[in-house]
């Protein structure tokens, strides 16, 4: 195998320079508020945290499960301004992005991922105020007015349901309060970073309170497009949230909120390199440049790549202006009734009803070859792109039966509708009985690829100037396009229960179970087009005139539709040994946890349903994970030290993995062989997680986080469909889990008291990541293979922050630098299906 690569490099805000942030906090000026503003960051980081991981509010240190929680105040102290930045402080959690802007990748304990196609789901999920976010699209939220984020590791199938086999990220917003409060944050940084956030909390009466927040966050980007002469990779995000709380008495609380956000970002920058010679043969794959264009086109392309690399890490020559636009609205209603005393034979009873709605519109255009040639681009144009609409309902009832027994029961319903495109071509095609020719203009997903020359093997080199003009190409509309539409409908129902029983002061038992039924349906239509006749936007791509027939679809596209129902029961059990306080120990526990989770089944999009051979491969079943975990949680030295640690083993079965199917006759489209997905593998995941927080000396604070994970296939073998009796074994291949084997994060700070009562607190944070083979993303890199061009050696980043707090006044100022040693490391690297392998580096 060849380890040659092409490169996409990414850095974060700081580039080794010092940035400046100013936080102005205005409050009602009560004595309590003043005391909180003057507290040290160490006290903030050791504050008791209340979480709702078991669907009721409990202390973090009382939860018999692996969970990390970070409050809004703690995020401010640690310099966390976006949800994805939290993963640096949480072992075995990876929050990053895919190769396209605003496409999130959530991976917990080696399970998860992210891809924009609405058909695909992944094993680690995200919730926003109780609403499940089923798609990876939308980008990570900023931390504007966030109460806390909870990161739950391990299967959460009992209380949260499907698609959280690795774990989940639970985001909780701040609720309106009865006292006036307000805050403003201004954050300035290099590369045009300008963030402004504001919040005001207003009590309208003794029973009605309102909370309003807004944010504008801008960033110019750190890539330079030397072909177009512009910066790229920039971001422009604006959001507004309004929340109202009505508390007519001690029994009732009614919350209503709405969040509207608009993101107008560039797509992620990148770089190609003259390193790879054996990329997959698809689109403009290695060798296809010369077959489809002219003798020498391949070397000309790599010469351009070399010129970009020589110009610097953050230089590329894309011929297109790319974008990633996301419009998002979330509306939520919560009604809670509290018995405020006995309810018949029960006590402390609570009924909680939640309803939520989310609408997300996504349009993008990405140049995947990063060169001045129109080799490979993908996008939705600027009209009907991808729309994801979801709504959900949940009803919870919890109560105490007696001093020893507590329970929670509930039911939920979730509905998702997702469209990639307007469905015009699909509807016309079906309306004509899938046989007559259809002419339509669609606005779904489009690809622009290297064209085929139908008349000869090689194009005359003298035509090269006409095919690949050297002048910048701002207009899209590259050659050889094809496109597709995808429609997805999901309906999910769940019934669940959880019980906690205290045998005595020392021992506690928790048991629970959930039944989930998931109804899924999808339509997929992929087609070739005959031209690019109507310009949608002169800076992006154009609309294609589509002439679709049954022969054309079978020959070079796909038409399929399928529906399936998947149901599972996911139990859990934990046994907790509570420890008595002693000379050093303030509180503590040991626990054993068994839990299960399942990832719902799915569909192979690139199969023609109207061909008999395609039927058996249209769908595949759920994945299942069983988790065995032993952990410890405790407080020492009068609460000045906190320790949370666990060891886990997860049995991962029925994994949805790809297998190769020979396609000489083109039944499965134009690729040969074609990769399809089925339940074909199993693996074992084991690891350790350790989190230590301590104020070991007056004014000082230390945090230490360690994560270790071992993720290997137990079996990944299957019979070769083209050669019965021949077994293809991939068991010794690496797993693309986007997680290093080991990670360590160490932070140290000390508060120095200045004359007059002011203070200054320097903070140093070191993060070490073990080596990682990103070539595993392609799914075909053996463990014993030489290091690929996508291999990431172990590396260390160092962040610094200095915070000034005055003796009086509700404000503070911080100067900070990220990656002050200017370390370069890979954010993402994969084999593109065209000409090369590309990677993304970060240099924060």
For each feature predicted by the language model, list its residue ranges:
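Membrane-embedded beta-barrel scaffold of Gram-negative outer-membrane proteins
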Residues: 332-338, 343, 348-368, 578-606, ...
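Structural signature of Gram-negative outer-membrane beta-barrels, strongest in the C-terminal barrel
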Residues: 245-247, 397-400, 406, 410-414, ...
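Conserved C-terminal beta-signal and adjacent last beta-strands/turns
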Residues: 7, 16, 20, 49, ...
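Solvent-exposed loop segments that connect transmembrane elements
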Residues: 222-231, 268-317, 367-383, 423-485, ...
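Outer-membrane beta-barrel translocator/receptor signature
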Residues: 121-123, 135, 144-147, 153, ...
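Acidic, small-polar-rich N-terminal luminal/periplasmic segments of exported/outer-membrane proteins
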Residues: 44-179, 630
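Gram-negative outer-membrane beta-barrel transporters
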Residues: 398-403, 407-408, 412, 505-509, ...
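N-terminal Sec signal peptide and the immediately downstream disordered periplasmic leader
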Residues: 1-78, 84-90, 201, 331, ...
